[in-house]
Regions:
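Nucleotide/phosphate-binding catalytic cleft detector across ATP-hydrolyzing
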Residues: 1-154, 162-280, 286-331
Length: 331
């Protein structure tokens, strides 16, 4: 039996697995819960995510990836093994070939750590692809043409920005500001403005339900529960979408600055292509309400979100391994 080709979007917040011929078959949080006393893993993925902030002292839920790179090698390897087996089921007899994406700014050492962890987790061969290239492929862009395309991939831990032409990256940057930082900015704002302590899952709920990077046509509100920092007692506060814009302003500004930086380094001919074709957004972070409008306003360039931004990187990573297995076409 032939081995299966798999593409893995190894994200700080989520892991997505793409299988050739089936598409994205698995999407789970990059979280592992283990018992500190015995060092045994108790849960991986969604089950572990539900334990964050709700576990007894001996059970800790950790994210083994930080800002797009491995921060805990052995936990990452076990997590990868679990997800690969879960995605494949028990139907495979041969180790799969796997392509994994990494942020564009990683070092060779960080890249090697991802490759080694994937091999240890059960891969036959490993191909590494940079996230912006994977995102562009997954967004349906023909990256082989001599034409400039700009991708802004906002994940959980990093934002990767790149200008791509002829199958390669011409200019790129990777900034450690992304979806997780949106959540942290909301936590800080609630603490400072409302004396309310909230957890990361509550911050994420605020971001998803009323979060905004750009003023909404009409203000919406959400009742938020947390702990009053003055009394130490539970408290409910009503938060508005305008407040989230204020909370997120510093973080979104850093992403805009990085976009400007890449545009300033782009050769003139490719700049003209980008002005014509626009900027394409991918990654879960780009789903923040108003971010598309904010980038468009600050750059003056038409900005659009990919059809399925959450899965673009996983699809592109999977199609990359398909391309490698088939080899280049005659043309």
């Amino acid at each position: 039996m032939l081995g299966t080709d798999i593409g893995i979007d190894l994200g700080t917040a989520s892991i997505l697995v793409y299988i050739k011929g089936k598409g994205v078959v698995l999407k789970e949080p990059s979280v592992v819960a283990f018992d500190r006393d015995t060092n045994k893993i108790k849960a991986i993925g969604e089950e572990a995510r539900l334990m964050i902030g709700r576990t007894p002292g001996n059970i800790v839920a950790v994210r083994p990836l930080r800002q797009g790179v491995i921060s805990d090698y052995s936990v990452t390897e076990k997590m990868l093994r679990h997800f690969i087996q879960k995605a494949l089921g028990k139907r495979t007899f041969k180790k799969p070939r796997i392509s994994v994406c990494v942020p564009s700014g990683v070092t060779e050492v960080e890249k090697k750590a991802v490759e080694d962890a994937t091999l240890q987790a059960g891969a036959r061969e490993v191909a590494i692809i940079e996230e912006p290239i994977a995102a562009a492929i997954g967004a349906g862009i023909d990256i082989t043409r001599p034409c400039g395309n700009m991708i802004v991939d906002i994940g959980g831990g990093t934002t990767d920005i790149a200008v791509i032409s002829l199958g390669g990256t011409v200019v790129s940057t990777s900034v450690k500001i992304a979806g997780d930082d949106f959540d942290e900015a909301i936590v800080r704002y609630m603490r400072k403005k409302h004396n309310l302590l909230i957890g990361e899952s509550t911050a994420e709920e605020i971001k998803i339900k009323i979060g905004s990077a750009y003023k909404r046509p009409e203000v919406i509100t959400l009742d938020v529960r947390g702990r009053n920092l003055v009394t130490g007692l539970p408290k409910t506060v009503t938060v508005t979408s305008d407040e989230t814009e204020e909370a997120l302003k510093e973080t979104t500004s850093q992403i805009i600055e990085a976009v400007h930086s890449v545009l300033e380094q782009t050769p003139p001919e490719l700049s003209a292509d980008i002005a014509d074709r626009g900027i394409v957004l991918t990654g879960g972070g780009c789903l923040l309400q108003g971010l598309e409008e904010l980038i468009e306003e600050k750059t003056g360039i038409n900005t659009m979100t990919a059809e399925d931004p959450m899965t673009a990187v996983a699809i592109g990573t999977g199609k990359f391994i398909e391309f490698l297995s088939e080899g280049p076409s005659d043309n």
